[in-house]
Amino acid sequence: LWAAVNERLLAAPAVSERARDLGTVEAIETVRWRAQPNLLWARVHTSVGAIGLGETYYIPQAVEHVIHDLAADLLLGQPAGAISSQWTALFSCTNFFGFAGAEMRALSALDVALWDALGQVTGVPVYQLLGGANRQSVQAYNTCVNAGPNRDWDHAVDDPGDLAAELRDLGYLGMKVWPWDKFAPQLVARGSTGPAGWSSMGPVGSYLSFGDLASGLSMLERARDRIGSSFELLVEGHSRWDINMAVRICRALEPVNVLWVEDICQPDSAEDLTRLVRETRVPQAVSERLISRFAFREVLRHQAAHVVLVDVAWTGGLSEAKRVADLASTYHLSFAPHDCTGPVTALANLHLAIAQPNCIGVEVVRGFVDGYYRQVLDTPLHLANGRLAIPDKPGLGAALSADFLAQDDVEVRLSK
């Protein structure tokens, strides 16, 4: 046995030679689309012909400048397969301002692109590079957005029980709604166009009346009355309430038996989150708004979360999202990747969910999956019976389609 092992080791190329075989970063492109003005795609071209694809979300012009004015100087000419080294180099500049914002979104997109390129060159799906498959498919829950062919938010408002039954029969794990956003202080009028999140942003609310509490609760009660225990209900809070109102909401939710409440208060205080966990019996999911493992460490150290939510496109790419998921596992907690944004993030989430044993499920907006995702990608996500199937192509398993890139409303910028 040892003779055979030694023979293979001697026959294998040196590590430095294998690294060269993966190529170097030759060019970096960013792609923006006027029809989805909050998305940015990053394409990393390598010297061996691979084109890795990444993505991030929100104020893409700022992220684009970070990529071309900062990251390109650090990445061009560097080994494309040395992902950890490139991540560390980029993070050393990003964390100069507190490792968040446009810098971290740029790092996230580029990191995912490097993983995609590595999978293409090595001929394996990204989940294999992350440790291999723990499952063959992942169950999804649907976030109820009006998008594409589906008007799920309108449906949730008008008849939440009917929507819950429909999604249950389609195989989904559950549905996520945000019943109390409309009662929080508003930055702009609902329905206003502008940066993503405007309709769910605003000053933190310090008072929710009993009547408004009951009004929001009725959406979930009507759904639960219709579907009983056969389907999960999830609540999104968008961090709109102070800790006292968060406690009030969560206590009211206890009889409904939701799978979790997500970001009902700001996630920047581990002490507040600890109070929420101790004073209510509703599972708390924390938080797509936490950036990097260092922010998650404080929450977990305080035992202030039941489920860890990670956004691959914001928190540092696949590299950092896997670190956070592994950190959650040391506390025996499940994790769930966040995505209400774009198709590449959905793909990256899928690979991480396939590889990570403590994944509870993935988020999708079915109107996006059945809508514009199909226009952007050359290979659509396979969502059937409420589950996303294991990808079988190298890398992430999809690229931006040639027809999409040729559209007049698509803008490309190149650094090389």
Model-derived regions, located:
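N-terminal export signals
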Residues: 1-11
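C-terminal extensions of enzymes
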Residues: 3-4, 371, 377-416
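Structured beta-strand/loop patches that form or line metal/cofactor-binding pockets in enzymes
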Residues: 9-57, 367-374
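Metal- or metallocofactor-binding catalytic centers and their adjacent structured scaffolds
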Residues: 47-122
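Conserved, mostly hydrophobic/aromatic
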Residues: 49, 71, 110, 123, ...
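Shared catalytic-loop signature of beta/alpha-barrel
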Residues: 65, 85, 251, 257-260, ...
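Proline-centered loop/turn at the N-terminus of a beta-strand
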Residues: 125, 139, 232, 283, ...
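Metal-dependent enolase-superfamily TIM-barrel catalytic cores that perform enediolate-based chemistry
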Residues: 137, 142-274, 279
